[in-house]
Amino acid sequence: MYESKICEILTHIRKPGDFRTPPKIAIISPTSYSRTVVADSIAREISVLVKRKNFSGEPFGKRELENLFEEHAVYVCEECQYLYERRPHGFDLLRLFLSSLVTNSRQVITTWNQYSWNFLSGFLHIERWFPIIITLPLLSLPELKKYLIADGKENLHFIIDTELDNSLELVRKDYDITISSLNLSFSIPYLTVQRRYASYIPLLADKQALPEELIFREIYRLSSGEPGIALKIFHDAIVEDEIRVTHLPKPLSVPELYAIDIFVLTLILMYELPVYSRLNESIQDKAMLNSSLYRLVSSGLVIRNEEVWCISLEGFAPVVDYLKQRRMIW
């Protein structure tokens, strides 16, 4: 997965005997799964030369950032959005980190949450610090199918055990535009009408689509092409050597929410480990926070996994679309 992106990053790694200052690299994706997979692959390729720093779980402060790039190595700094999202005065830490990128000659590869990066791009023009920006796109249906089959069990049986609703539905899509000369990327939303499932293979109207194709199409629709979410749905749906339509989660639609609910969803989407205490730091009225979490759980959009609150798998795509429409993320 993302082989071409990994190869592109490796071409920018400084070779022995090359004394030029290597470009700083930013890897961006909507969820942590994709960028973690790519970071792991890069670290394996340059194993003896790499030092990794993950800002989502390791303690750090001003002193650690000032001494971060002392050793001769290739640095992979992961989840860099938590430099400013984790604590008061976080933007001071972020600026210190960015300044240290400019003042050292080390090879530095960073990973970022897509929504945090978009905010920093509008607020700080953060792309100025990174000559090489690698965006990990959502997978297409054929790419997602190939990835899941490679990771799944052999000899799986795909079974359609319920009547499928093949009605027309209105789908929001984005047309991506990149202006290389301005180092600018943006998307234009548009609406299209399509059937929920393809009962027949295009151009072969007399040949019905296989159950395997219909099930992968539903997984793709539920995950919006996000490989980490699709992999979780795929594995959870496998019972012994069968995967049935009824094993897949039901798609959700987001009801009209209060402003506080939208804010809570935004916090959960941004934080790597959104435990209750962290949400309470942003929303200090516990009664208001508890009421919002109750509404979100009741609608199936949010679940609690031990101490961590997270957006449900089937709720991720509609929640992201909902927040984009209200300009909470972009």
Regions found by a protein language model. Name each.
Residues 1-15:
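N-terminal pre-P-loop "Q-motif" helix
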Residues 82-83, 90-124, 130-137, 141-144:
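Sensor-1/coupling segment of RecA-like P-loop NTPase cores
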Residues 134-212:
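Conserved small helical "lid"/interfacial subdomain of P-loop NTPases
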Residues 283-299, 304, 314:
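Short amphipathic alpha-helical interaction segments
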Residues 315-330:
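Short, amphipathic alpha-helical interaction segments positioned at domain boundaries
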